[in-house]
């Protein structure tokens, strides 16, 4: 080893593949990085002489191994590595140098001298023999320890000594009696491993086995293994590697394996491991077996009685361990999830080697592949390249010969790029240099231009004072005017010396005018004005800023802290430069605090206060004589804003605060203005239950304007400060909507929880109905207190599990909030919030109601009303209620409280003296509503006014004209009638009276009146002699009841208004008073006007013990309304109903004597796909009238037509008319009048069927002088005249339906048909003229042969050979041939099938709605011989899927098919599919396009599977068709087919094992003859079945299925014709033919014969063409003659 400078660690790394293979042979897993770390860094620190370069010295290896395996402070993760080191030293491979091998041998034979061991210390605790094995039972008894061996055996190192039985080690050393021992107490290196089964002496026989003794695992080992490894579900590789190493190194027993399974795995994981292990039990042939006896023998679930001191016992234990490890690996396999692997991306600062380890770990966790195997190297390499950092990825993708690079080579290349990356400082320096260089390039042209300008100025200034001459003689220069130059101290004005001209006393000084100089002409000019400066505190430091409104950003000269990454280019007078921005800085201005980022410009003369900060501070600059002054904006004005539905509050007069300050002092903790937000302390957190199958929904936040975001920010911040909102991370998200409060610029946050409300379970709403809430308030209680709870919903806590449902996005960069927020209290907008709060508050206030019966407490969600008969009771009750609310944690709004008053406002009502009034604010709201212009505005008006309908008598009558305008489907036209109704409602609202509160101790009286289809009434109670109104009721009757007689409409009105009155009376006695004898009508109802169900409903409501009817009265309060004022006289309702029942008083239903008798009937049936109908009239001997009716006429309609025609033909006569139609009979006698009275409308307000025929019948019924319409049974066999006449009418109806004479209309009587009179003699044409006439007629109509023949027959022309001429003309029409469809009738042929199963398959894709795992296609294979079907769900419809299923499913189970049939889909014609067929020798037959009948068997199976899946989904309630597919296949494979055999029986020769199959054959030899007999019989049965089916499938005599021959001209069908495009194209020349398809010239694919038809013969003589001319109104028609004709 010393000659080649190689070390043991370098040798192992250079031959790492061999080392890893050796580790696999030892059933352990090692990694290269950890191998190097443990050898060079970890083991040298143990202090046993391990060198950093490694060693093969067994003494040192065993010393390290002892520390690794020790009980306390051991290293379980290093066990596989030291075991492999030991194996390398004991069994050195060839690449270990000879010197190392010699050193090993010499080292193993040389005893190591050790220090004498010190005498053992006395134990602290007494020795205990019982070992705690957790919850596992005691292991089976093992033989006692044998005496110490006389000579050392070859176990452990050769020089190691066997341990003395009196000196226990292993797990016993970890017990309390051995815990003080030190590993260093041993005299030499110890090779013993702490094993559950360890050798205790020499074998008893020379060639016997070494006896073993059981040493259980210690609790510390189990705890370390449990805590130092991740769970099996998170990372199966960790525990799998641990147990593999334990199985090899510790040799655990069956009990130890169960203990490890129980400690290290969960119940579900343990069951999965055991199940997978039992699947991997090997049989005698070395393959996994399914025999239960062999499985139980090799892998028992109960404790076996194995003797581990025998060879058989040890062999069984070895098999058990191997099987358990195989089950562990099988359970560790996870479904392939490559998406998780693709999510592993290299971090910005992550080394490539670490990234590769993470990537390979992801492959192990999320795929069943081994990333270190050779087969997966390419996939791992591609993932490593594709998921690396962008710069590394770019470099690796440009490598040449990338396919030849290994993973190690790729990591090396990636490391080069990684280490060449620039640091953050280098990057900033580079960016700075680039910015400077960019700035220099930009300023270079400017500097050039500036240089030119300066040069021009200098040259211009120099040329102004020069002369053209004397350029070289400077001494001779003189002024231009010839005056001598002045001396230095000479005055230019007076020429005296001693002063200058500006100081000359002789010069007259002119007073300068005070003007404002706009330029200073180069001088300093006037003194500048004082500049406005302010001092602000930035991060605690006062800084004086110069206010500069021209600066866009505020500037600091020093950063005063950290500088952010943001940079800005500043353009100045000397050029541009890049300057940084600071991070957020805190500014204090008086009581305000603002955070702001400043631009740092060191060259700036002073800090600047720019427009950005001035705007944020709302600064104001004022200029005065003292100088400019800067002031900061005041606080925003606060406005009170109400909801839209509470707009009436804007018109309410301010209620003077009646709260005595003593109330605020007595109860300081209940008022929201003082105590803050409340919290219900006795209500548990609310748990929101989701619907079954609900999945998280994330709705993106809507765009929000800056103004709106700034408006709702204070509200969000307030809730954050109070803890009502908290940050969160949730898969749920709903948008936040800023709603602007009307009349102000303030916004409030409203969360759109509609998607959440859809996915949350509904609960029954228990919120009281405000309509009848005040009914429980006694009128004698006239002292009231009204309390309004503040932030009511926020008083209830929301369970933490339900809080993520209500998350929303919120970003506030100034406060540092970015992400999601959610509510910790019950949110507003949640559909169940009112019900949940109402129930919680009701439960909390239940004790108060029980302890205070002297007051009445009404609760509507968060609005409370306390009522009492006296002031003292009201005051005491209010005080106790406030105390109770304070104790419960609720808060009351002091501003809205109304305490101990006689007049209060509650729920929009004014309560006073036991009555309720409409508040003036509500009236003002309705009065200020403008005239509606849209249907929605009409609905809003009716909704707002409808709230006050109890105070408006006859509201439904007043609003009736407006209801049609609420529909969006009709045009909105506002007429005078609508305006009057609109004004009348407002006028009635102004005069609304006071309504008395219902007194439940007194009876009620309900006055009813019905006018114009509207039920009106007034509910009253008596007060002395007066009747006080409680409520005015009105409602519109339904369309059916509106058509009844007046008496019956009164019954419907009573039933309708009694329902509304019950909401106020709460089930008290009610007396009904009307102007009709209602009780007699209800008890003896007419059977012709209403159905039994409706009458039963009315009787259940009205014939009640609490409802009584008073005698009819002429005057009642309901008639005081502004309608007809005439009094209705008292009448007899039975007489009026009798008069209004029929349409004709003398109409009889019994035959009249001595008058003619007619029989009518109607028939309707379907023939040739069309519904035909006919109607006749017979008199018993002959047909009076008969006609066919238009196609699609029903039998009921035909009956009405026949009866109407009979009545018309009998005009002015006496007649008996029989009909067997109950529909026609009832319409004539009863229903017709009812239909007409109600406007021929159904109960839903729609037109009834056969409306026109019913009106015609009602008109015709008055035409005869006397008439009797009698009903007779149909289809009678008797010989009486009625039965005979009915049968003749039925036969005549069928004959009339098949006739060609169609009744044009049914509203006018039909005259009897008279034979046509021959007026003129027909004219005969020659054959040529006749053919020309037919040709011209066909060009005008383009009719077919039959219709054209009928048309010609109606003319007065005689044409020879008419039929042949018509056929010839129609067959030669080119337009008809290109457009008309053709029906082909051919003999049914036989499809080609296989001669045995698995030979001929048909395959097809069918699309189904998306199912589980994204499967939305079904790939169906069907064996044409047996009908056996195979179906596979797929995500895509590709050729790879087809090939995969053929190779993996069809070939292994059925063999290589000879023929595959499919359509021309892309997945079947692809090169991959056809190439596979070629390689396997499969004849892949592609069917003709647009001919699904060619794949009829698989297409029919597609339909069968879909229908079966639909039925199974309806039966089981399941929605995933993938789960139901096996059941559908089971039904398809076991459904009898054409021969009465199922596909299963044809394929396997016997019935499916669904039912009990009789005796089973065992493995005993006695059953071999029986088994042989069964097999022989099976072969015979299957052969007979196959031969019979094969004989049936043989093709018969070959017939010509189509008439097309080679050389024919044919037309080909267009399968997708466009608008106004011919159905056929062509003509084409036939080139080749088969029995079913034709090959034509010009089309590449074969065309099925059903898609062809013969081309018409073209006219050989001439053709016409249409040409366009230059004139826009002219066209040129040109005739061209065929050249061949010439």
Curated annotation (Swiss-Prot):
Biased composition (Pro residues): 137-151
Site features described as Cleavage, chain residue numbers: 125-126, 195-196, 454-455, 516-517, 640-641, 1309-1310
Cofactor remark from the record: The RT polymerase active site binds 2 magnesium ions. Binds 1 magnesium ion for ribonuclease H (RNase H) activity.
Residue ranges of every copy of the Peptidase A2 domain listed in the record: 543-613
Zinc finger map (CCHC-type): 489-506
Active site annotation, chain numbering: 548 (protease)
Chain sites annotated for binding Mg(2+) 4: 1404, 1463
Span(s) of short sequence motif PPXY motif: 139-142
Cofactor: Mg(2+)
InterPro entries: Aspartic_peptidase_AS (IPR001969), DNA/RNA_pol_sf (IPR043502), G_retro_matrix (IPR000840), G_retro_matrix_sf (IPR036946), Gag_P30 (IPR003036), Integrase_cat-core (IPR001584), MLVIN_C (IPR040643), Peptidase_A2_cat (IPR001995)
Lipid attachment site numbers (N-myristoyl glycine): 2
Residue span of region Disordered: 110-199, 419-486, 1304-1325
Binding site for Mg(2+) 1: 788, 862-863
Similarity comment: family membership: Belongs to the retroviral Pol polyprotein family.
Comment field on protein domains: Gag polyprotein: Late-budding domains (L domains) are short sequence motifs essential for viral particle budding. They recruit proteins of the host ESCRT machinery (Endosomal Sorting Complex Required for Transport) or ESCRT-associated proteins. RNA-binding phosphoprotein p12 contains one L domain: a PPXY motif which potentially interacts with the WW domain 3 of NEDD4 E3 ubiquitin ligase. Matrix protein p15 contains one L domain: a PTAP/PSAP motif, which potentially interacts with the UEV domain of TSG101.
Protein name stated in the entry: Gag-Pol polyprotein
Species assigned in the record: Gibbon ape leukemia virus (GALV)
Gene name per UniProt: pol
């Amino acid at each position: 080893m010393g000659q080649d400078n190689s070390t043991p660690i370098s040798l192992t790394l250079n031959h790492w593949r061999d080392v890893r293979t050796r580790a696999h042979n030892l059933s352990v897993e090692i990694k290269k990085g950890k191998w190097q770390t443990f050898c060079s860094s970890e083991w040298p620190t143990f202090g046993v002489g391990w060198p950093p370069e490694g060693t093969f010295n067994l003494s040192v290896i065993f010393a390290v191994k002892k520390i690794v395996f020790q009980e306390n402070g051991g290293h379980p993760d290093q066990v596989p590595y030291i075991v492999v080191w030991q194996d390398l030293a004991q069994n050195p491979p060839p690449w270990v140098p000879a010197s190392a091998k010699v050193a090993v041998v010499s080292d193993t034979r040389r005893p190591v001298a050790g220090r004498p061991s010190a005498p053992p210390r006395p134990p602290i605790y007494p020795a205990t023999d019982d070992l705690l094995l957790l919850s596992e039972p005691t292991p089976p008894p093992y033989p006692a320890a044998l005496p110490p061996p006389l000579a050392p055996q070859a176990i452990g190192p050769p020089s190691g000594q066997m341990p003395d039985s009196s000196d226990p080690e292993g797990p016993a050393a970890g017990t309390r009696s051995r815990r003080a021992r030190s590993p260093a107490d041993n005299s030499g290196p110890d090779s013993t491993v702490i094993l559950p089964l360890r050798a205790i002496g020499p074998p008893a026989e020379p060639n016997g086995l070494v006896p073993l003794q059981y040493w259980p695992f210690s609790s510390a080992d189990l705890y370390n293994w449990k805590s130092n490894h991740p769970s099996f579900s998170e990372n199966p590789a960790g525990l799998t590697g641990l147990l593999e190493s334990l199985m090899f190194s510790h040799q655990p027993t069956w009990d130890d394996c169960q203990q490890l399974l129980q400690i290290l795995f969960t119940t579900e994981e343990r069951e999965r491991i055991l199940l997978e292990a039992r699947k991997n039990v090997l049989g005698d042939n070395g393959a996994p077996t399914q025999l239960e006896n062999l499985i139980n023998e090799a892998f028992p679930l109960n404790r076996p009685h194995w003797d581990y001191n025998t060879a058989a016992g040890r062999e069984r234990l070895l098999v058990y361990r191997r099987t358990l490890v195989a089950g562990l690996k099988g359970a560790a396999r996870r479904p392939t999830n490559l998406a998780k692997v693709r999510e592993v991306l290299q971090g910005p600062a992550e080394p490539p080697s670490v990234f590769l380890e993470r990537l390979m770990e992801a492959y192990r966790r999320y795929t069943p592949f081994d990333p270190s195997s050779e087969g997966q190297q390419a996939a791992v390499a591609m993932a490593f390249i594709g998921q690396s950092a962008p710069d590394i990825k770019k470099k690796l993708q440009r490598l040449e010969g990338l396919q030849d690079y290994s993973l190690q080579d790729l990591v090396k290349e990636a490391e080069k790029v990684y280490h060449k990356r620039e640091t953050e400082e280098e990057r900033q320096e580079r960016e700075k240099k680039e910015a400077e260089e960019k700035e220099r390039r930009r300023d270079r042209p400017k500097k050039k231009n500036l240089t030119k300008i300066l040069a021009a100025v200098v040259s211009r200034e120099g040329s102004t004072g020069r002369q053209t001459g004397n350029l070289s003689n400077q001494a001779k220069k003189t002024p231009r005017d010839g005056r001598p130059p002045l001396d230095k101290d000479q005055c230019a004005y007076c020429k005296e010396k001693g002063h200058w001209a500006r100081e000359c006393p002789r010069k007259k000084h002119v007073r300068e005018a005070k003007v404002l100089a706009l330029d200073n002409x180069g001088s300093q000019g006037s003194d500048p004005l004082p500049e406005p400066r302010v001092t602000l505190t930035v991060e605690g430091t006062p800084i004086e800023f110069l206010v500069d409104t021209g600066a866009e950003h505020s500037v600091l000269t020093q950063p005063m802290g950290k500088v952010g990454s943001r940079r800005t280019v500043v353009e100045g007078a000397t050029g541009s430069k890049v300057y940084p921005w600071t991070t957020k800085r805190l500014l204090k201005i008086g009581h305000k605090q603002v955070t702001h980022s400043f631009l740092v410009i060191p060259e700036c003369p002073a800090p600047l206060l720019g427009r950005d900060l001035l705007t944020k501070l709302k600064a104001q600059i004022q200029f005065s004589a003292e100088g400019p002054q800067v002031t900061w904006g005041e606080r925003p004005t606060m406005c009170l804003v109400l909801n839209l539905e509470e707009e009436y509050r804007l018109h309410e007069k301010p209620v003077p605060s009646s709260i005595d300050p003593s109330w605020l002092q007595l109860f300081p903790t209940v008022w929201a203005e003082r105590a803050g937000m409340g919290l219900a302390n006795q209500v548990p957190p609310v748990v929101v239950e989701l619907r079954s199958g609900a999945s998280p929904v994330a709705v993106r936040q809507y765009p929000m304007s800056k103004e709106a975001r700034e408006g709702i920010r204070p509200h969000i911040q307030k809730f954050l400060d109070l803890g009502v909102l908290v940050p969160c991370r949730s898969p749920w998200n709903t948008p936040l909507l800023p709603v602007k409060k009307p009349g102000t610029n303030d916004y409030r946050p409203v969360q759109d929880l509609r998607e959440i409300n859809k996915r949350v379970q509904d609960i029954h709403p228990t919120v009281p109905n405000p309509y009848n809430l005040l009914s429980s308030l006694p009128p004698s209680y006239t002292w009231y207190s009204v309390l309004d709870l503040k932030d009511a919903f926020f008083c209830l806590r929301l369970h933490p599990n339900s809080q993520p449902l209500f998350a929303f996005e919120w970003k506030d960069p100034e406060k540092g909030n970015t992400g999601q927020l959610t509510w910790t209290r019950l949110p507003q907008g949640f559909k169940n919030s009112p019900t949940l709060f109402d129930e919680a508050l009701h439960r909390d206030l239940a004790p108060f109601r029980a302890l205070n019966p002297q007051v009445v407490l009404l609760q509507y969600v968060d609005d409370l009303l306390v009522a009492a008969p006296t002031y003292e009771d009201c005051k005491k009750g209010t005080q106790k209620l406030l105390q109770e609310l304070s104790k419960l944690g609720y808060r009351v709004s002091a501003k809205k409280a109304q305490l101990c008053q006689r007049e209060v406002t509650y729920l929009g009502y004014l309560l006073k003296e036991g009555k309720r009034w409409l508040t003036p604010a509500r009236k003002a709201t309705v009065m200020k509503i403008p005239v509606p212009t849209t249907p929605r505005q009409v609905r809003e008006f009716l909704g707002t006014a409808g709230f006050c309908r109890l105070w408006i008598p006859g509201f439904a009558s007043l609003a009736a004209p407006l209801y049609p305008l609420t529909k969006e489907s009709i045009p909105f036209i506002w007429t005078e009638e609508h305006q009057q109704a609109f004004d009348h409602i407002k006028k009635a609202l102004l005069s609304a009276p006071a309504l008395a509160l219902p007194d439940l101790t007194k009876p009620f009286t309900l006055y009813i009146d019905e006018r114009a289809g509207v039920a009106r009434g007034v509910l009253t109670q008596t007060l002395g002699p007066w009747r006080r109104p409680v409520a005015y009721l009105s409602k519109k009757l339904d369309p059916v009841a509106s058509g009844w007689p007046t008496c019956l409409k009164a019954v419907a009105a009573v039933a309708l208004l009694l329902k509304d009155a019950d909401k106020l009376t709460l089930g008290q006695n009610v007396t009904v008073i009307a102007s009709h004898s209602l009780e007699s009508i209800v008890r003896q109802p007419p059977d012709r006007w209403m159905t039994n169900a409706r009458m039963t409903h009315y009787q259940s409501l009205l014939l009640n013990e609490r409802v009584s009817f008073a005698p009819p009265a002429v005057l009642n309060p309901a008639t005081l309304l502004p309608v007809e004022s005439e009094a209705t006289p008292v009448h007899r309702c039975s007489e009026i109903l009798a008069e209004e029942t029929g349409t004709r008083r003398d109409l009889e239903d019994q035959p009249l004597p001595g008058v003619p008798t007619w029989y009518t009937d109607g028939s309707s049936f379907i023939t040739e796909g069309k519904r035909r109908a006919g109607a006749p009239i017979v008199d018993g001997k002959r047909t009076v009238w008969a006609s066919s009716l238009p196609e699609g006429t029903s039998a009921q309609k035909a009956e009405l037509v026949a009866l109407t025609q009979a009545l018309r033909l009998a005009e002015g006569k006496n007649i008996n008319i029989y009909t067997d139609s109950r529909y026609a009979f009832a319409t004539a006698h009863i229903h017709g009048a009812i239909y007409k009275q109600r406007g021929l409308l159904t109960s839903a307000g729609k037109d009834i069927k056969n409306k026109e025929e019913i009106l015609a019948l009602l008109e015709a019924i008055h035409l005869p002088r006397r008439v009797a319409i009698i009903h007779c049974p149909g289809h009678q066999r008797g010989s009486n005249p009625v039965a005979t006449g009915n049968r003749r009418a039925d036969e005549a109806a069928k004959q009339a339906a098949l006739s060609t004479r169609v009744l044009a209309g049914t509203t006018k009587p039909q005259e009897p048909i008279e034979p046509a009179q021959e007026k003129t003699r027909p004219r005969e044409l020659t054959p040529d003229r006749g053919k020309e006439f037919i040709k011209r007629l066909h060009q005008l109509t383009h009719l077919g042969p039959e219709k054209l023949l009928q048309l010609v027959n109606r003319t007065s022309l005689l044409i020879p050979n008419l039929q042949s001429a018509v056929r010839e003309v129609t067959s030669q029409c080119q337009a008809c041939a290109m457009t008309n469809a053709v029906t082909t009738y051919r003999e049914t042929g036989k499809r080609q099938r296989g001669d045995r199963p698995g030979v001929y398959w048909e395959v097809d894709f069918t699309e189904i709605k998306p199912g589980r795992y994204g499967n939305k296609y079904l790939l169906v294979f069907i064996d044409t011989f047996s009908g056996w079907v195979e179906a596979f769900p797929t995500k895509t419809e590709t050729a790879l899927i087809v090939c995969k299923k053929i190779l993996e499913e069809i070939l292994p189970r059925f063999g290589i098919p000879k023929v595959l049939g499919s359509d021309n889909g892309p997945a079947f014609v692809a090169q991959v599919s056809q190439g596979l067929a070629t390689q396997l020798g499969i004849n892949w037959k592609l069917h003709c396009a647009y001919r699904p009948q060619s794949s009829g068997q698989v297409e029919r199976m597609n339909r069968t599977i879909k229908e079966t899946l639909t039925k199974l989904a309806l039966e089981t309630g399941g929605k995933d068709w993938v789960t139901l597919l096996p059941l559908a296949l089971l039904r398809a494979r076991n459904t009898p087919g054409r021969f009465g055999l199922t596909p299963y029986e044809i394929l396997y020769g016997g019935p499916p094992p669904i039912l009990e199959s009789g005796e089973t054959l065992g493995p005993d030899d006695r059953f071999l003859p029986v088994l042989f007999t069964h097999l022989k019989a099976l072969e015979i049965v299957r052969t007979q079945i196959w031969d019979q089916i094969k004989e049936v499938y043989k093709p018969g005599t070959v017939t010509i299925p189509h008439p097309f021959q080679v050389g024919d001209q044919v037309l080909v069908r267009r399968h997708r014709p466009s608008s106004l495009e011919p159905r056929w194209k062509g003509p084409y020349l036939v080139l080749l033919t088969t029995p079913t398809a034709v090959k034509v010239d010009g089309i590449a694919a074969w065309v099925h014969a059903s898609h062809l038809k013969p081309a018409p013969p073209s006219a050989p003589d001439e053709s016409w063409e249409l040409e366009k001319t230059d004139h826009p109104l002219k066209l040129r028609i040109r005739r061209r003659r065929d050249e061949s004709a010439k």
